[in-house]
Amino acid sequence: MTGEVNVEQVKVLLNGVLDPEIPALTIADLGILRDVVLKDGVFEITITPTFTGCPAMRVIEEDIEEVLRLEGISNFKIKTVIAPAWTTDWMSEEGKRKLKEYGIAPPSVSTEDHLKAMITGKKHAVQCPFCDSMNTRLTSPFGSTACKALHYCDACHQPFEEFK
């Protein structure tokens, strides 16, 4: 980029950074990218992991650095914030749509409702991303990553993950 770079231009660049574990989504889609501000000539980029200790965060930081440096932007710092903790409520509707297209069931309830269900032992229904059936069951609370659970659809006989 030439000339003065503003916050909106940096946000546009960062909106293209893909999540390394789910490359169909950007870090903005997932709500990992929390904020970009300009303070004293330095862009402060705030990110929040989907889970504390998420192994993808270092790759995400490196990808952010690469995107900005390729555009000639070196006046930035990346700040990882774990409080407040990430919530699926931060995901964009576009991100949820992309998850489903990718074959992962998007979160179907708010984080608050999900926590209430965990406390009370009440299970929430998860819609199959392949056939849209609600005739599904949890097979494991953890999928390929800590932020996903493994389910099985009794209608189309497909295993699938749910983003939790």
Task: Go through each PLM region and give its residues.
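Domain-level signature for proteins that mediate thiol-based redox and metal-cofactor handling
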Residues: 1-164
